[in-house]
Structures are given as structure tokens and as C-alpha cells.
Amino acid sequence: MAVRVLLVEDMKQMQGVIVDLLSAVGDFQVVALVATEAEAKLWLSENPDAWDLAIVDLVLDQGSGLAVVPRARDARQGKAEIVVFSDYASGGIRAHCEKLGANAVFLKSESREFMDYCTAFGGLAAAAPVA
């Protein structure tokens, strides 16, 4: 069963890169691709159980991924993973994202570590019993 991904990223080129990375490491299906905080919050409120992994950039066209992370956390109440993948996820920001509910935080320059995380998550999701 494919891992259902909510991708919150405003840069078209980066959207393509992330989709390509996901397809290279496992069975991932991007079920929603949004570019703003408002779009992400709306999608989460309308589709609270339609995703397994949220990948969130912090700097968006409008708004911030920092407001999306807790909304995603509240929507799935620990039943999904939230990963921040951003150029702005340095020291204090990383800790703040984790406090808000992110399971992992990666700089975009840490693409290898991000891929390793997604590979491991995809393997765990594939091994989980279907409810």
C-alpha cells in the first residue's frame, strides 16, 4: 500500500525534486500538493485521514509551514508522520518544529538524510497491518 503524502511546498522546481526523490525510494503517492499555509490548513481540515506523511516547507508563498505543523499534528493525533524539509531549519528552528509536532526536520541540503528517513518510513508503513 502506497504511503499517502501531503506535500506543502511553494517552489515548483522543488515540488518536482521531492516527488522524484519519493518515487526513487519507495511506494509514495502525493495525494495533495499545496503552496500556501491557507491551502494546507484547508486541505487538512477537509481530509484529516487522507495522508500518512506530511512534508512541509517552512517558507511558503503565503504564510508559514510553522503554522501547518501543529495543524497536521492535531489532524492525525500521532497516526501520521510530519517532516519539515526546509532551507531554514537550523538549530533553534529545528527544535521549535519538533516542539510543534514535527517527527523529523531536515535542511534541504540534507537530501540524503531525508531520503533515508523516507525509505525507512515507507518500509515501516508497508509492514504495518491494514486496519
Predicted regions and their residues:
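Two-component/phosphorelay signaling modules centered on CheY-like receiver
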Residues: 12-32
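Acidic, metal-coordinating helix/loop segments flanking the phosphotransfer/catalytic sites
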Residues: 33-53
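Hydrophobic/aromatic residues positioned on beta-strands within the core alpha/beta folds
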Residues: 84-85
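Conserved phosphotransfer cores of two-component systems
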Residues: 45-49, 71-79, 100
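Conserved acidic carboxylate
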Residues: 9
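Alpha4 helix (beta4-alpha4-beta5 surface) of REC/receiver domains from two-component response regulators
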Residues: 67, 88-105, 112-115
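Residue-level signal for the "D+5" position in two-component response regulator receiver
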Residues: 33, 59-63, 99
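Conserved phosphotransfer microenvironments
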Residues: 51, 55-72
